[in-house]
């Protein structure tokens, strides 16, 4: 159901171009990641390990074939996005380990962010990290409400896997990342409104 609707959305957004089957494959992987992480608290390496080089290859294809409709058309930005996504989430996890004596996220999250960085590049990696934080807050809000206002007296800490938030943010960036970045830059006055 969900995957079929997302496939339809990809086709409607990208049309009959090279981007459509590539983004359908990416979406299918992100749906799998979401449900596996929700159930098992793991993100399959079988998706992230091949996904990182595939994203870089797609950036190269888009450089050669601009009509592909792929968003990213720079191998340098693809590699930079993968590196930044991985290192930033790893850094946040290390900070959490030092400050709170526990991991803030797992290695699967780092690799998933690297994969999305490879597909969408440096600027969209920043967007995906920001969006995933907002998505995580939205997903956690019912749990937080129940714990503090719903009479749940359980003293155990609440945990929610971060992979689904990253996956949802990646899908948002795929559909409208460039428009969101452009809108933000216009809002802060970094570029003239067009």
What are these regions (language model features)?
Residues 1-16, 180-194:
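N-terminal transmembrane signal-anchor/hairpin module of polytopic inner-membrane proteins
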Residues 5, 31, 56, 92, ...:
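Hydrophobic residues within the alpha-helical transmembrane core of Major Facilitator Superfamily
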Residues 6, 10, 14-17, 39, ...:
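Juxtamembrane loop-transmembrane helix junctions in multi-pass integral membrane proteins
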Residues 8, 12, 60, 141-145:
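Membrane-embedded alpha-helical segments of multi-pass transporters/permeases
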Residues 20, 25-137, 182-194:
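Functional transmembrane core segments of multi-pass inner-membrane proteins
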Residues 106-108, 145-172:
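Interfacial loop-to-transmembrane junctions
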Residues 123-158:
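Conserved post-catalytic alpha-helical subdomain immediately downstream of the catalytic base
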Residues 141-145, 158-160, 183-191:
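C-terminal structured domain segments across diverse proteins
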């Amino acid at each position: 159901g969900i995957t079929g609707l997302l496939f339809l959305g990809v086709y409607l957004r990208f049309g009959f171009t090279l981007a459509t089957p590539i983004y359908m494959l990416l979406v299918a992987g992100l749906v799998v990641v979401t449900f596996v992480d929700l159930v098992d608290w793991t993100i399959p390496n079988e998706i992230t390990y091949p996904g990182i080089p595939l994203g870089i290859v797609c950036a190269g294809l888009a450089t050669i074939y601009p009509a592909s409709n792929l968003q990213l058309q720079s191998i340098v930005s693809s590699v930079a996005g993968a590196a930044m996504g991985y290192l930033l989430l790893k850094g946040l996890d290390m900070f959490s380990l030092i400050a709170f004596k526990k991991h803030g996220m797992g290695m699967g999250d780092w690799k998933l962010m690297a994969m999305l960085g490879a597909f969408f590049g440096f600027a969209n990696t920043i967007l995906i990290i920001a969006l995933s934080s907002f998505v995580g807050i939205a997903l956690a809000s019912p749990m937080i409400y129940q714990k503090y206002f719903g009479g749940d007296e359980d003293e155990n800490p609440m945990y929610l896997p971060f992979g689904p938030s990253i996956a949802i943010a990646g899908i948002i960036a795929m559909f409208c990342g460039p428009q969101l970045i452009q809108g933000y830059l216009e809002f802060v006055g970094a570029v003239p409104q067009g």
